[in-house]
């Protein structure tokens, strides 16, 4: 079985990501279908007398996978906007475009 | 040294007929220059054209509504998914778009569209064959012979996953340093083909997608069987890159960018497989005593 960490940590991470997603719209994240579904799913699998409940583990795995999805999309978009957002050529030929982004990106790459 | 670099930059600019001040996508070139060269401008992104996103249940499954419009696939079919959780996740993707719609962040929507439209026109057997074919060049089976530290790292990190897969499915996989890769016995292929045949068409699309991203069927099986987390599987897939990064340094705008993109795609594919293959059944436990 995969080492997932504590369900509480995953739950907190999911709430954080839902807050980020809804920050731009200004709508509270508790109003979203995703939040309501996650609350229902976590509650449904909380009560069990078995120590190793496969269904519980499956839910936690899916929740952790969804958290990874939301987090990595957010970080990917942030990196895209910081380094690739101006539509210039990427990689080694950045310097030809003369854009201000390229030299900074190269400098950042060589920082210790 | 810097003067030489600046001189080279000027030579480069002159070769491409670029003006000294540099070129941006919005500037035009004067009529005297023969061949205008513009920086690549990606096609304009679609603006967000809807206020509310909701889901509803129709005949074929769950549908996504953007305001009063029903979402459709690129080929015009009604967008319907079999699972409520998947529908909610897709609706969340659409609702999280801000001013413009960034399709490259909407991996679950893309996977659903692929499953509904099947643009490559592949049937179940073809999808299974495509996934099992990766075993011949599976990342975790392909070993280097040097440097010694990388050889040891591959052995320590990849051997346990291969042993797990061999025990779990009762097959032989092994690893190889040969350029042709490991020789996979026919029986191993048969067993894995019949295992994958137990998945439905949608889940298989997801499995084939993850295999293509990670370049490994063994790691994908680790994900579908809850043996590895997405972060672990991505790390194992990128083991040599991580080794080189530790040695030579990290370049945020390249390495981290690729890492986050791979994590996002793998997580989307894994979640897609799980949500398409589960069946929710409520079992009431008998109260004792």
Swiss-Prot record, chain B:
Family: Belongs to the ATP12 family.
Modified residues (N6-succinyllysine): 133
Species in which this protein is naturally found: Bos taurus (Bovine)
SUPFAM superfamilies: ATP12-like (SSF160909)
Biological process terms in GO annotation: mitochondrial proton-transporting ATP synthase complex assembly
Protein's membrane topology: Peripheral membrane protein
Cellular compartment(s): Mitochondrion inner membrane
Pfam families: ATP12
Keywords tagged on the record: Chaperone, Membrane, Mitochondrion, Mitochondrion inner membrane, Transit peptide
Chief localisation class: mitochondrion
Protein's name according to its UniProt entry: ATP synthase mitochondrial F1 complex assembly factor 2
InterPro entries: ATP12_ATP_synth-F1-assembly (IPR011419), ATP12_ATP_synth-F1-assembly_N (IPR042272), ATP12_ortho_dom_sf (IPR023335)
Any one of the GO CC terms: cytosol
Function: Plays a role in the assembly of the F1 component of the mitochondrial ATP synthase (ATPase).
Assembly behavior: Interacts with ATP5F1B; involved in the assembly of the F1 component of the mitochondrial ATP synthase (ATPase). Interacts with FMC1.
């Amino acid at each position: 079985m995969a080492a997932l960490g504590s369900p509480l940590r995953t739950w907190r991470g999911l709430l954080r990501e839902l807050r980020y997603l809804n920050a731009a719209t200004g709508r509270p994240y508790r109003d979203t279908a995703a939040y309501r579904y996650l609350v229902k799913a976590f509650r449904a699998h909380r009560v069990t007398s078995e120590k190793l409940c496969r269904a519980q583990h499956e839910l936690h795995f899916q929740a952790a996978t969804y958290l990874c999805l939301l987090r990595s999309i957010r970080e990917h978009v942030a990196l895209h906007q910081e380094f690739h957002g101006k539509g210039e050529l990427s990689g080694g030929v950045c310097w030809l475009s003369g854009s201000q982004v390229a030299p900074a990106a190269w400098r950042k790459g060589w920082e210790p | 040294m810097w003067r030489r670099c600046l001189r080279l930059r000027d030579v480069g600019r002159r070769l491409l007929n670029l003006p000294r001040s540099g070129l941006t996508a919005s500037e035009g070139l004067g009529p005297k220059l023969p061949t205008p060269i513009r920086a690549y401008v990606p096609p304009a992104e679609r603006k967000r054209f809807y206020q509310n996103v909701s889901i509803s249940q129709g005949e074929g499954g769950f549908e996504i509504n953007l305001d009063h419009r029903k979402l459709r696939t690129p080929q015009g079919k009604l967008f319907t998914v079999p699972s409520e959780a998947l529908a909610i996740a897709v609706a969340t993707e659409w609702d999280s778009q801000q001013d413009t719609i960034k399709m490259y962040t909407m991996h679950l929507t893309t996977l659903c569209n692929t499953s509904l439209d099947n643009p490559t026109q592949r049937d179940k057997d073809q999808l299974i064959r495509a996934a099992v074919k990766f075993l011949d060049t599976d990342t975790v089976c392909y070993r280097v012979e040097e440097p010694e530290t990388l050889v040891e790292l591959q052995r320590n990190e990849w051997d346990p996953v291969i042993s797990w897969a061999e025990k779990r499915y009762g097959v032989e996989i092994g690893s190889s340093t040969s350029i042709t890769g490991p020789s996979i016995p026919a029986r191993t292929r048969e067993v894995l083909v019949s295992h994958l045949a137990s998945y439905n068409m949608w889940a298989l699309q997801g499995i084939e997608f993850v295999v293509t991203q990670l370049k490994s069927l063994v790691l994908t099986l680790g994900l579908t069987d809850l043996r590895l987390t997405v972060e672990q599987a991505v790390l194992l897939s990128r083991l040599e890159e991580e080794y080189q990064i530790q040695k030579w340094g990290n370049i945020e705008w390249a390495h981290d960018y690729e890492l986050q993109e791979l994590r996002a795609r793998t997580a989307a594919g894994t979640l897609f497989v799980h949500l398409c293959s589960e069946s929710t059944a409520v079992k009431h436990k008998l109260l004792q005593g």
